Each structure stands twice: as C-alpha cells, then as structure tokens.
C-alpha cells in the first residue's frame, strides 16, 4: 500500500518535500474542545502570545533558511484586536519577504469577513481541521454548546473556498469508537469539499483534558494508531492523487521515525516548528509532543 502511494505521489506531485515553518503564536483560546491541551478551561496552561517582533524573528529565520512558506497557528480568538493584529502581521511578512513567503493560517473558526480581510492582506492558505465527519464523534470531541458545531466548522471551510484560499482540513485518527468506515467517510469528505491540503494524524491524549481522562484506558495502542495514520495518508494519496498531505508532528509523537514513514507513505509536506524556544513547551495540544527542545 505504501509503495503504491509513494508511486502515486512521485507521479502527481513529485518526490520533493515542501517545508512550511510553523510558528505557534499564541495558546490563548476561547474554545473548550474536550481533547485539546490548550482548551479554555485547562488552568494549568501557562498562556502566552508572541509579540510582533518575536514572530518576525521567527519569520526571518524561516526565510533565511529557504523555506517556501510559513504557517501561523494559534488558539482561537475572534476579537477585533486579534483580527487586526493578524492582518497587520500578514502585511508585514509580505513586505519583509517581497511577497516570496507563502502564508498559511491555522487560526480556527472566524467570520467570512475576517477570512476575507486576512486573504486581502496576503494569506493564501488556511488549515481548519474537521476533526471527524462522524457527527456522534464530533459532538463527543466538543462541548455541546452553540460555539462548537459541525455545521459552523463546515460552513467556515465553504467560506474559505468562496474567498479564494487553498483550503486545508484533516481529522484525528484512532479515536475510541471510530471505525474504518468513519475514516473512509473522512476521505470522501476531502473529495466532496474539494480540499487542497490535508493535515491529519493519530490522536494523542492530553492528561489534563476531559477526554484524556475518559479515554486513557480504552484508546487503541500507539502502534495501531501510527499504522492507521500511515494508512490514511496512503489511501488519501492514492484516491486524491495531487493534494498536499502533511506528515504531522503527531506521527512523530508516537513513533520517532513517524514523519519519515509518513513521507514514504505518500505525504509531501513537513511543518517543522519555529516557535520561540521559551514558548514551545506551552503549546501542547497533546502529551509528549516532540521537538519542543529543537532550536
């Protein structure tokens, strides 16, 4: 399966691996997703927001090391202060790099107007994970309130497409009670939504979360989750042929060779973290995250 996926990758997107420098600019979040380490109600988290100059330091490093693009990721905020901070930041990155650096955003659910402002400032890709297309699983991953609905998440992906972004999404793999049929439906969702890039990886628990507690004894083995993660990359590559697929940090979190195995199974994007060292260990969406001491 992996060999076939690699052949399809070589034919449709080439053997080249594209690097995106990932900067985790803030772990402040208004959401309360039940699996995530930086959820609003986790009071053990040391919250931070990088300043513009700190972020630009990281951008400079990424640019000087010949990365083609950067990705800005943070917890979700929808206030005007945050929205205009990002808008200004995008413009500054564009100016600094003479528009050479591609800009990917992963900043959660926003209004169509906000997405448009960021697009017009110069961002051209957006990653917003659907997490799972099985509604029962989706609703179990999130609090049942009007801030965490599948409909809004899907609508946001449609807004992004309408505005002109390259649209990225992805799912968590190896969740308790998730079937192979669910995962196949996730891949069909990528096709139906005409998704351009995919970032998906094995689920990893975070002990200070509701699901980290609820699932700690029933989660499938790490080996099985890695295997499922790699199979998902391979089948997605064979089925969708020319999409961009990331070999995610979560794969590496469960297997030291996980990202390399991901590339051999059909992935073509790596997203090394360029977050400031002093903040890396605060942006922990799950336990045992790799790379937090890498400089």
Each predicted region: which residue ranges?
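Glycine-rich, proline-tolerant flexible connector loops at the mouths of alpha/beta enzymes
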Residues: 20-23, 43-46, 71-83, 141, ...
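Auxiliary Fe-S-binding modules of radical SAM enzymes
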Residues: 1, 7, 63, 191-295
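Canonical Radical SAM [4Fe-4S] cluster-binding loop centered on the CxxxCxxC motif
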Residues: 7, 13-54
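Core AdoMet radical
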Residues: 40-54, 62-83, 89-90, 94-156, ...
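Generic structural signal for well-ordered alpha-helices
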Residues: 21, 56-59, 86-91, 115, ...
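Conserved, mostly hydrophobic/aromatic
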Residues: 5, 33, 72, 128, ...
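Catalytic cores of alpha/beta
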Residues: 111-120, 176-191, 253-264
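Conserved strand-turn element in the central/C-terminal portion of the radical SAM core barrel
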Residues: 70, 77-80, 104-106, 110, ...
């Amino acid at each position: 399966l992996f060999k076939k996926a690699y052949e399809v990758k070589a034919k449709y997107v080439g053997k080249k691996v594209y690097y995106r420098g990932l900067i985790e600019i803030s772990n402040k979040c208004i959401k309360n997703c039940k699996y995530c380490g930086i959820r609003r109600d986790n009071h053990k988290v040391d919250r931070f927001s990088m300043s513009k100059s700190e972020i630009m330091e990281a951008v400079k490093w990424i640019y000087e090391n010949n990365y083609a693009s950067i990705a800005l990721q943070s917890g979700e905020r929808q206030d005007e202060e945050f929205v205009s901070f990002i808008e200004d930041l995008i413009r500054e990155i564009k100016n600094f790099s003479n528009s050479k650096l591609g800009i990917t955003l992963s900043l959660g659910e926003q209004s169509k107007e906000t997405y448009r402002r960021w697009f017009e400032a110069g961002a051209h890709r957006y990653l917003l994970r659907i997490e799972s297309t099985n509604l029962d699983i989706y609703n179990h991953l999130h609090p049942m309130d009007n801030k965490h609905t599948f409909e809004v998440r899907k609508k946001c992906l449609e807004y992004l497409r309408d505005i002109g972004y390259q649209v990225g999404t992805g799912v968590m793999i190896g969740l308790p009670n998730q079937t192979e049929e669910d995962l196949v439906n996730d891949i069909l969702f990528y096709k139906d939504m005409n998704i351009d890039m995919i970032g998906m990886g094995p689920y990893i628990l975070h002990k200070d979360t509701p699901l980290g507690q609820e699932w700690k004894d029933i989660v499938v083995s790490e080996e099985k989750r890695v295997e499922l993660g790699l199979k998902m990359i391979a089948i997605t590559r064979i089925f969708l042929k020319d999409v961009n697929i990331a070999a995610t940090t979560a794969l590496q979190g469960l297997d030291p060779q996980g990202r390399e195995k991901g590339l051999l199974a059909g992935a073509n994007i790596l997203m090394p973290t360029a977050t400031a060292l002093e903040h890396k260990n605060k942006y922990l969406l799950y336990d045992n995250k790799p790379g937090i001491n890498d400089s």
